[in-house]
Amino acid sequence: MAKSQMALCCMSHSPLLNLPGPAQELLDDIEGAIAAAREFVAAFDPDLVVTFSPDHYNGFFYRAMPPFCVGTAAAGVGDYGTYQGPLDVPADLAIDCARAVLDSDVDVAVSAAMDVDHGTVQPLQKLFGDATAKPVIPVFVNSVATPLGPMRRVRALGAAVGTHLAGLGKRVLVIGSGGLSHDPPVPTLATAPPAALDRIVRGVPMTTEQRQARQAAVIEAAREFASGQGALAPLNPDWDRAFLDLLDNGRLAEVDSWDNRWIAEQAGNSAHEVRTWVAAFAALAAQGKYETGNRYYRAAPELIAGFAIRTAVCTS
């Protein structure tokens, strides 16, 4: 079988892209960068998409929180105005991928009924216009629910997935979704009130009123953060740019020594979502050297995020 052709697109996500509040200039600037990435993806025209993405207690909960999970079937939950309904997941290809990862000594769970939120669906909609436009294998990377595993295991996951994908003889796009520096209001085991605790542990569904209240809280938190108020950790553009430089220059192995506490201290608790970028770049790097393009970055307090985009193709 011929070797696969692979390409990559990593991008930040934010529920606030679909909510009132951010200035139109900011939204237009980000949309322009996304449009360029969309053109890159359209020109590549993948046969298969593999997403590495986090979850925000919409599909994975503390009753059983895997570090990694491959979905053999998946559906969007429809949070923050994103698509609700089944994705086009090729079950046989997904289970083969999971088996290959396990054979590579990386422990990964399998879900035959994976619920995915805006972290997975938003980039699919932004890049393809329709979350169901392409067959997709969703790979969950825990980036929120501590304790988290070491970064070297994330890179090992990506490398194992990429090695497997290289042998499929397809045009494969890998997507990493999340980051960069940001510290949005997310409940934790230590601080969550009873209702939120039931949700993040047992997966108790949110009522319509609770979803509306959470959305309003996110909008208010972003407004306060953009005005320099509130208790959220500040963005760290220097850290973000250093991370992007590491990726641009093929120094991915350096993340193996990163300490989880250091990441949170430097860039906020949800900066751990850069794990999805590490996994995606490791998957691409499994084919050889790569070159990045569509290099976009903007510190965006109105989105509570350092917002970045990268595309990449193999050069070897």
Swiss-Prot record:
Molecular function (Gene Ontology), one example: ferrous iron binding
EC main group: oxidoreductase
Catalytic reactions of this protein: 3-(2,3-dihydroxyphenyl)propanoate + O2 = (2Z,4E)-2-hydroxy-6-oxonona-2,4-dienedioate + H(+); (2E)-3-(2,3-dihydroxyphenyl)prop-2-enoate + O2 = (2Z,4E,7E)-2-hydroxy-6-oxonona-2,4,7-trienedioate + H(+)
Domain of life: Bacteria
S-S bridge residues: none
Gene Ontology process terms (BP): 3-phenylpropionate catabolic process
Record note on quaternary structure: Homotetramer.
Record-given protein name: 2,3-dihydroxyphenylpropionate/2,3-dihydroxicinnamic acid 1,2-dioxygenase
Organism: Mycolicibacterium vanbaalenii (strain DSM 7251 / JCM 13017 / BCRC 16820 / KCTC 9966 / NRRL B-24157 / PYR-1)
Source species taxonomy: Bacteria, Bacillati, Actinomycetota, Actinomycetes, Mycobacteriales
